């Protein structure tokens, strides 16, 4: 018998909290982001899907917006993230993606929230930046912040499409932020989007 996702969410939430409490979290180069916040600006943290666990240890409880797959597994993730204070738009590249993007823009604009996006999710290809994060940052005039979650000790789920990384208890997690930048193009045609996705991928790889 399949257990409904909503019944699993509380246990997963408390498991995450207990696991997170064992980690030694270090945020690197957050000062440029703090200066943007001090000036009333918005940011979109852009990370790889396989490093999501480490990345949200630095951002939990910050009332951020994210986009989560419309799949059943996505329902579990959305439930846990919601309990952590995230606002989750449900969608993907193949289902409801445009609607989720519009919802995310509206909530970030109306509520003054920042965003966090797994740029190659929810199904890959691994470490290939998709278009959505570029459109999101451009529509909001928000700063993009390349973000890596680097763990000293981790379990790698080798059979997962993204080789998901789970930091082991007592591991040191370095959440490394690249320099924030804005998308300068006034309009986004496909060549401009392709340039921006390549630019972001290069910045992410350079961080680790």
Model-derived segments and spans:
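A cross-family acyltransferase "interaction/gating" segment
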Residues: 130-187
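Catalytic core of membrane glycerolipid acyltransferases/transacylases, capturing the structured
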Residues: 42-96, 157
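Catalytic-site beta-strand/loop segments enriched in glycine and acidic/polar residues
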Residues: 104-136, 140
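Generic beta-sheet signal
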Residues: 91, 118, 146-149
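Short, hinge-like loop/turn segments at secondary-structure boundaries
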Residues: 82-85, 107-108, 161-168
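Membrane-anchoring hydrophobic helices of lipid-metabolizing enzymes
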Residues: 1-62, 105, 168-170, 195-208
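Short, charged beta->alpha transition segments
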Residues: 74-78, 100-108
């Amino acid at each position: 018998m399949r257990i409904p996702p909503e019944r699993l969410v509380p246990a997963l939430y408390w498991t995450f909290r207990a696991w997170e409490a064992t980690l030694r979290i270090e945020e690197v180069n957050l000062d440029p982001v703090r200066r943007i916040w001090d000036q009333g600006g918005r940011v979109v943290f852009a990370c790889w899907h396989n490093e999501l666990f480490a990345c949200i240890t630095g951002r939990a409880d910050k009332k951020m917006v994210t986009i989560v797959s419309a799949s059943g597994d996505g329902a579990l993730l959305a439930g846990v993230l919601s309990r952590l204070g995230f606002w989750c738009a449900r969608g993907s590249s193949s289902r409801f993606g445009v609607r989720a993007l519009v919802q995310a823009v509206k909530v970030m604009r109306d509520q003054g929230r920042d965003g966090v996006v797994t740029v190659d999710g929810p199904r890959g290809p691994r470490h290939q930046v998709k278009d959505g994060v570029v459109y999101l940052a451009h529509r909001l005039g928000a700063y993009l912040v390349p973000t890596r979650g680097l763990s000293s000790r981790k379990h790698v789920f080798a059979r997962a499409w993204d080789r998901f990384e789970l930091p082991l208890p007592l591991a040191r997690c370095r959440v490394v932020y690249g320099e924030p930048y804005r998308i300068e193009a006034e309009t986004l045609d496909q060549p401009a989007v392709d340039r921006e996705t390549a630019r972001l991928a290069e910045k992410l790889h350079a961080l680790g």
